[in-house]
Amino acid sequence: MKKIYVLLLAAIAMVSCSVERHPEYMMDDDTMTKNIDESFPSLLNGCYGFLKTWSDPMYRCGEYAGDNIMIRGTSTDAFYEFISYSRTPNNYRLQNFWDYSYKVVAQASNIIKDIPEGKSTITDTQLGECYYLRGMIYFYLCRAYGRPYAQNPDTNLGMPIVNGTPDDPVHAMLPNRSTVKE
């Protein structure tokens, strides 16, 4: 009976805490727009933080399927599917590549949307980094999932262009794939 009281007291103590703290990896709109010069480096670092997970599959998606790399034998690694030309839909490495790519695109696009240009040269330089990151990600996504540009860029399918996060994610429409030229 004593253990039940102790557990009940511990449960009440845990639930009754009124301290509200935001996760360290998130920034609310008020903090972001109140002082852009202080919040911009943190937001941009968030983009680069996603690239840590993204960079490993980035070069593998492009190089393993080509003839630049030769691996002898077999492997159980998910990227071995690229070398053997047998991709499966549940390849977790491809899923991570796709997910983190669009996380970088969303973060960079939201920064571009929320922070005005022309405020200072430092802000414009950092906005340029956001434009670059978004373009670089689309390039690598198109390289991994799209058709070659040299064949027919007007009709070859590229990637869905999603610049930002939707205001209403529940009713958001998924975009069509754009062409490689777009």
PLM regions and their residue ranges:
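Bacterial Sec-dependent N-terminal signal peptides
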Residues: 1-26
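Membrane-proximal, proline-rich intrinsically disordered regions
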Residues: 17-62
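Short, surface-exposed recognition loops and adjoining beta-strand edges that mediate ligand/DNA contacts
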Residues: 29-30, 34, 58-71, 147-155
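Secretory-pathway/luminal and periplasmic proteins that interact with or process carbohydrate-rich
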Residues: 52-57, 71, 137-148
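Short alpha-helical hairpin
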Residues: 64-89, 161
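Short coil/linker segments at helix-helix boundaries
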Residues: 144-182
